[in-house]
Amino acid sequence: MAKAKFERTKPHVNIGTIGHIDHGKTTLTAAITKVLHDAYPDINEASAFDQIDKAPEERQRGITISIAHVEYQTEARHYAHVDCPGHADYIKNMITGAAQMDGAILVVAATDGPMPQTKEHVLLARQVGVPYIVVALNKADMVDDEEILELVELEVRELLSEYEFPGDDVPVVKVSALKALEGDKEWGNSVLELMKAVDEAIPEPERDVDKPFLMPIEDVFTITGRGTVVTGRIERGVLKVNETVDIIGIKTEKTTTTVTGIEMFRKLLDEGQAGENVGLLLRGIKREDVERGQVIIKPGSVTPHTEFEAQAYILSKDEGGRHTPFFNNYRPQFYFRTTDVTGVVTLPEGTEMVMPGDNTEMKVELIQPVAMEEGLKFAIREGGRTVGAGQVTKINK
């Protein structure tokens, strides 16, 4: 069966849900698809909770893509929405997921107010450069006292300001995702109001379409009879079918190949552009030739490196960071784009140790090469938990 072509008539914006576990991120995601389907049935499909909760790709391909993607449209825009799992051990996906957002819907239960993971997700949103946040004050149907709602809203605004988001100006919309999902008209309207706020408060992103093509690989799988497909979000540039690309990073040698097909939401494209989540079919490439963490680039536009200088912020104990300082030759993982690479840290002259909560300069030597340029951001992690964040300031080798 031929695939429908993807229509690119409306502005395309990537958003997602973030926030504490059980505050209703996935329920809200499902409610948005239902309410928009009811309002504009010709341009929206409804996605059921369990379909999103289990990430449908997982079941279809027998491989784990651990972030659920749904798409929907308002009158003004086409949205691709990622639902990030809430647990701390999914923070890796929070990092890859949040990196895919032009803006985020921060879900806070009115019954609880901001909780530790709310804080952690806002901090991560700040670190990975999520530029705009809209707040959904969920479960508002369960709070009778207007004053409590106001207090919770104030707390959320203060939290956002603390992490350098414009807390006073961020839209806060009271919703009940569950009631909206159950078909309650009034609470359904609250979800439409939320999406109106998203339309207005999350600007259309400036796309990097004019820069040379680059896409970090998130996943690799084989489609029987067609070959190897890699998926990811195009970070910048434009890629047309039948163009030549290099695959670099992680391995010592680069691989050169031709892209024979580009897909988005199971529809075929002639080209993929910055900001879009796509699958690329690669000619003559085996499943084991490529891996998550590598990047696909316009040939020669970026080079892999192992030694760099960086400015980093080390999380305080209260932010979920280390409880003790680290010293020279500290060996954490550096999380670049979609993968962890171990590196050895050299501290500046005269710095004996770095305390949780400090900013520091550092030199890093990685055990595997990473495609990098100045300004590239990374997280510093230990055993799966984020303990710092930084940016490459200079490449040495």
From Swiss-Prot:
| Residues annotated for Mg(2+) binding in this entry | 26
Q: Which GO terms describe its cellular component?
A: cytoplasm
Q: Which GO terms describe its molecular function?
A: GTP binding; GTPase activity; translation elongation factor activity
Q: Where is this region: G5?
A: 176-178
**Is Kinase found in the keyword set?**
no
Q: Where is this region: G3?
A: 83-86
Main localization of the protein? cytoplasm
Per UniProt, subcellular location reads as:
Cytoplasm
| Keywords in alphabetical order | Cytoplasm, Elongation factor, GTP-binding, Hydrolase, Magnesium, Metal-binding, Nucleotide-binding, Protein biosynthesis
State the HAMAP family in the record: EF_Tu_B
Function, in words: GTP hydrolase that promotes the GTP-dependent binding of aminoacyl-tRNA to the A-site of ribosomes during protein biosynthesis.
| Family recorded in the similarity comment | Belongs to the TRAFAC class translation factor GTPase superfamily. Classic translation factor GTPase family. EF-Tu/EF-1A subfamily.
The UniProt subunit note reads as follows: Monomer.
Protein name per the record: Elongation factor Tu-1
- Species, as recorded: Streptomyces coelicolor (strain ATCC BAA-471 / A3(2) / M145)
